[in-house]
């Protein structure tokens, strides 16, 4: 018979060997999982890239539909959009939404609204406005077609620092703006103006605030979009009479007065030093600011308004209107686009 002490030693050894085997097995499984992680990430990345490429191809298809529409209008004339012809364009507008082109869809809606109004009252202002919308639409078609085609050919589906993404209908996420280096820390903003308007083409209210960055003197804007269907879910912005202190300020791609946003802020009272600082950022010469505005606004895709600060010598009446004069005597009609240099 085998002695009891030998049997106990064997049992202990078998138990120890089993534990070591279990540990080795667990380690092997962990290593296998770790090795699979890059594969899983790579697979997810490929799937995401494929989805983005598919979306770009879909957008390009929609762009060609819009391009054909513009060509038809240019061939037959804007007036053909009125009366019975408008239904065709309304149908096209709905289609553009299916091609991830909500920005282009919005422009088509603006065009339709102006031509409907022209068909009713025959006022030239509607026809002229429609012509501007048509030019803006055609510019967006050409630039976005070129941009998206280049993305496909280079196999690059990453987001870029370009305003085209938003103008086509994309919605920027804060982390995306941060990844592009479009965020800066510790900004102080003072609101200079606030306005609420109704966007008939988008069936939404837009709260717009114009702010000055007290650190740089740059004029920036906030936009809060409130669709009519979701008014009870989206809080309306309001006038701000204090200095807004922002830990991280995100700036959207674009020209002129860039759009900004932030998550979380604190406030402090406005001081005399703040007002003096705002005044120090004002331009001395109207002619210089007019040149800047013209260079920005000549781009058909630029915002329709450009904000700037001008130090004036005098503001007085000119007929039934007001005019601003700088220290050189150069003037501009306030509230109008009539410039006298």
Language model features with spans:
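Active-site-proximal cofactor/substrate-binding loop regions of enzyme domains
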Residues: 1
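Conserved small/polar residues in nucleotide/adenosyl-binding loops
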Residues: 339-341
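Extended alpha-helical scaffolds
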Residues: 12-168
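Extended, amphipathic alpha-helical scaffolds
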Residues: 161-334
């Amino acid at each position: 018979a085998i002695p009891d002490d030998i049997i106990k030693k064997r049992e202990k050894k078998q138990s120890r060997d089993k534990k070591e085997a279990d540990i080795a097995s667990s380690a092997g499984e962990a290593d296998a999982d770790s090795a699979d992680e890059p594969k899983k990430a790579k697979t997810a990345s490929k799937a995401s890239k494929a989805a983005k490429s598919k979306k770009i191809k879909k957008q390009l298809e929609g762009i060609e539909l819009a391009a054909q529409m513009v060509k038809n209008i240019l061939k037959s004339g804007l007036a053909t959009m009125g009366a019975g012809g408008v239904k065709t364009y309304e149908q096209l507008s709905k289609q553009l939404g299916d091609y991830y082109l909500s920005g282009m869809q919005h422009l088509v809606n603006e065009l339709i609204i102006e031509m409907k109004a022209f068909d009713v009252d025959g006022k030239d202002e509607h026809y002229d406005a429609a012509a501007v919308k048509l030019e803006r639409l055609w510019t967006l078609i050409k630039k976005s077609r070129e941009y998206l085609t280049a993305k496909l050919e280079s196999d690059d589906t990453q987001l870029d620092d370009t305003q085209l993404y938003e103008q086509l209908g994309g919605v920027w996420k804060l982390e995306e703006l941060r990844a592009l280096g479009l965020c800066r820390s510790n900004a102080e903003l003072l609101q200079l103006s606030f306005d609420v308007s109704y966007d008939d083409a988008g069936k939404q209210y837009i709260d717009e605030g114009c702010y000055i960055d007290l650190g740089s003197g740059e004029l920036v804007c906030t936009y809060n979009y409130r669709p009519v269907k979701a008014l009870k879910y989206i809080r309306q912005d309001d006038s701000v009479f204090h200095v807004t202190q922002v830990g991280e300020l995100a700036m959207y791609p674009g020209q002129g007065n860039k759009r900004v946003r932030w998550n979380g802020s604190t406030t402090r009272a406005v001081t005399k030093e703040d007002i003096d600082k705002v005044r120090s950022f004002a331009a001395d010469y109207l002619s210089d600011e007019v040149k800047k505005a013209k260079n920005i606004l000549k781009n058909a895709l630029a915002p329709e308004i450009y904000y700037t600060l001008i130090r004036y010598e005098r503001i007085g009446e000119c007929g039934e209107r007001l005019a601003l004069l700088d220290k050189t005597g150069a003037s501009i009609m306030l509230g109008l686009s009539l410039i006298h240099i």
